Amino acid sequence: HLCLWIFPYIDENSKYFKEAEEKGFLVKNTKGVTSRFYSTATSTSKVGCFDFTNPHFIEWYKPKVRSVVSMGIGAVKTDFSEAVPEDAVYFDGSTGIQGHNKLTFLYAKTIYDIMAEVKIPLGELPMLWGRSGYAGSHTIPAAWAGDSSTHLNNHACILRGGLSASMSGIPFWGFDMGGFYNTDHEGYECVPTDEEYI
């Protein structure tokens, strides 16, 4: 089965950015303009965040994702959604702080609902790996722990996180076995040691 990766941001250089912005489908800032930010520390261009509190956006977005899922996609990994600035203002009036966790759930739920619409009529189960979550995330089948460090002491933290997730009702949970990246004492990414890698 093929698993696709998706994130809730759109690069400001994308040909679809202007359309989404003009339709009011991107999270705004307190000045009423699209909130643009760097999604990672190494990003070279800014992004806007899709506003999953806007029902008009959901109507516009679902057919686009559904068309891809209908090609036979077995699972979707919903990545990111935590980087929205605190001065954000969502369609439903939530501030960046109020909507921070709500966005992560609505994003995953939207994708999961699309998966269910496509998969259940085929007699298949929808599968979504969600990175971030909130109240209600237990209704989505699986959680992924995100980009974990390869340091051996980090494995204990990941295990605690997985146990906590299971106690919160999340039935399936996974992580990057052996870690995804390594950082040195200054916080710079570096190559894992042979022991950490294995």
Predicted regions and their residues:
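Catalytic-domain carbohydrate-binding cleft regions of carbohydrate-active enzymes
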Residues: 1-198
